[in-house]
Amino acid sequence: MSVSGLPFDDFRTLLRDLPGPDARALVTARERDAQLTKPPGALGRLEEIAFWLAAWTGRTPAVNRPLVAIFAGNHGVTRQGITPFPPAVTQQMVENFAAGGAAINQICVAYDLGLKVFDLALDYPTGDITEEAALSERDCAATMAFGMEAIAGGTDLLCIGEMGIGNTTIAAAINYALYGGSARDWVGPGTGSEGEMLERKIAAVEKAVELHGDHLDDPLEIMRRLGGREIAAMAGAILAARMERIPVLIDGYVATAAAAILKAANPSALDHCLIGHVSAEPGHLRAIEMLGKTPLLALGMRLGEGTGAALAAGIVKAAAACHSGMATFAQAGVTNKD
């Protein structure tokens, strides 16, 4: 990143100058779809997914190197008693990912997806957002830059996920800051907060947004003050994918909050993204609607780990396979409609 100016300056420049889709590839995909052995529109959203792939990759729809990227971070706000699990669980789950024992590992095997896990200074939780900013601008920008490395090994479909005890509190605070309403609108149980603990979680979100209220007109400031390292890294990964025209599948409530930061900075910033699923976390559907998106799946999941995005990758792979592998009417000797 630049050694001059403020730490966020380079990201602001990138967000102003985002590349768009390949219009010619989109036209070509639509023309081929019209000749495939099916009635127009019969494959529903699979057709739109194929067009989306073509437009962003600039070629015939294909998924050859899908990747799930999980970003793990810890949060100082857990000191407020807002979650039943201790922060140590974040590191333990990272180790579980490495050992192949988590749900995401099984889904990646089932759908032939690559998996990378990014450990984001787990021994150094972010600042407690009810008392101070989560990150300095320099640390936040550096973490965004680190997240951009998610695509370094090459991928043509990036699935964005996370792991972090306390991060549904962070996501709720971001959504509350971006969209308003009340803290209660955005706070859900997460990993199992209920009763008095849930009330503490709501109070923490209210206190954090009030504390930082004078600085919340800038999306990047919202991210550094109310977010976390996995939020910043996911935002960086989504932005890096856009610069390389790599399609992205966004996972659950927390990943959607990271994406919302980019959308607030540039309304077109998520055009290369689809939402993999709507989770059972109460605020997620509303957050998705605020982004103008429609999730691919609704399975009642609320695990995180990129699991919903990974499952949606199977649908995207199927959409590409149908578009590329189906015969045309002429090839199959099937009579087309008049």
From Swiss-Prot:
Superkingdom in the source lineage: Bacteria
Enzyme Commission number? 2.4.2.21
Q: Name one GO molecular function term.
A: nicotinate-nucleotide-dimethylbenzimidazole phosphoribosyltransferase activity
Q: In its keyword annotation, does this UniProt entry include Transferase?
A: yes
Question: Enzyme class, one word?
Answer: transferase
**InterPro entries to which the protein is assigned, alphabetical:** Nict_dMeBzImd_PRibTrfase (IPR003200), Nict_dMeBzImd_PRibTrfase_bact (IPR017846), Nict_dMeBzImd_PRibTrfase_N (IPR023195), Nict_dMeBzImd_PRibTrfase_sf (IPR036087)
Q: Which Pfam families match?
A: DBI_PRT
Kindly list the biological process annotations in GO that this record carries: cobalamin biosynthetic process
Q: What does this protein do?
A: Catalyzes the synthesis of alpha-ribazole-5'-phosphate from nicotinate mononucleotide (NAMN) and 5,6-dimethylbenzimidazole (DMB).
Q: Which family does it belong to?
A: Belongs to the CobT family.
Its protein name is Nicotinate-nucleotide--dimethylbenzimidazole phosphoribosyltransferase
Q: What is the source species?
A: Rhizobium leguminosarum bv. trifolii (strain WSM2304)
> Where is the organism placed in the taxonomic lineage, from the top?
Bacteria, Pseudomonadati, Pseudomonadota, Alphaproteobacteria, Hyphomicrobiales
